[in-house]
From Swiss-Prot:
One of its GO terms (biological process) is photosynthesis. The chain crosses the membrane at residues 33-53, 74-94. Belongs to the Ycf4 family. Seems to be required for the assembly of the photosystem I complex. Keywords: Membrane, Photosynthesis, Thylakoid, Transmembrane, Transmembrane helix. This is Photosystem I assembly protein Ycf4. It comes from Prochlorococcus marinus (strain MIT 9303). One of its GO terms (cellular component) is plasma membrane-derived thylakoid membrane. It comes from the Bacteria.
Length: 191
């Protein structure tokens, strides 16, 4: 999976009874770096607008006070507001850790539970293990690559198990898919 696999064997039994997989959400280093860069850019444009309006240099580099406020300063202010709004959205998504969750497969209870954190609530799907027909691996290369691991469930659409974002390495995707298919005792499709 895209995150740590924690397998919990049942006490007194050599076989695995439970498989838990945590899924990484929006709180990734790449998203945090992007939010920092957008915040700095938005503040820079906003301070340039204010410097142009007040006639004083508020930034240590350049001389934004020499810009005319009406055409250039005003446009810089609009860019600054747009940048700060985008940065606020990114920081809010990082704060709530959108998309984080877990995949729980429990042979003892015969249930699969998939949980993800949504915008305003926890999204959860539960279904019987016997309804799982296969583990599906999807690989598409090109401009917008796709490497996804999903469950094929009877009477439902395919349920994605991997995180959204940067594609997983192919070897890790194959290994995780084979491990899950072996645990669930179902076929591995798509390879």
């Amino acid at each position: 999976m895209s995150a740590d696999l924690q397998e919990t064997p049942k006490a007194g039994d050599a076989s695995l009874e439970r498989l838990e997989q945590s899924v990484l959400g929006f709180r990734r280093l790449s998203n945090q770096l992007l939010a920092v860069i957008v915040t700095i850019g938005g503040l820079g444009f906003t301070l340039t607008c204010l410097s142009s309006y007040l006639g004083r240099d508020l930034l240590p580099i350049g001389s934004p006070s020499s810009l005319l406020f009406v055409p250039q300063g005003l446009v810089m202010g609009l860019y600054g507001i747009a940048g700060l709004l985008l940065a606020s959205y990114l920081w809010a998504m990082i704060n709530i850790n959108l998309g984080a969750g877990s995949n729980n497969f429990d042979k003892a209870s015969g249930m699969v539970k998939i949980c993800r954190r949504g915008y305003f609530k926890l999204i959860s799907a539960e279904f019987p293990l016997k309804d799982v027909k296969a583990v599906k691996v999807e690989v598409r290369d090109g401009f917008n690559p796709l490497r996804r691991l999903s469950l094929r469930v009877q009477g439902r659409r395919d349920i994605t198990l991997t995180r959204v974002g940067q594609p997983l390495p192919l070897a890790q995707l194959e290994q995780d898919g084979a491990e899950l298919a072996r645990f669930l005792d179902v076929n591995l499709e798509g390879l």
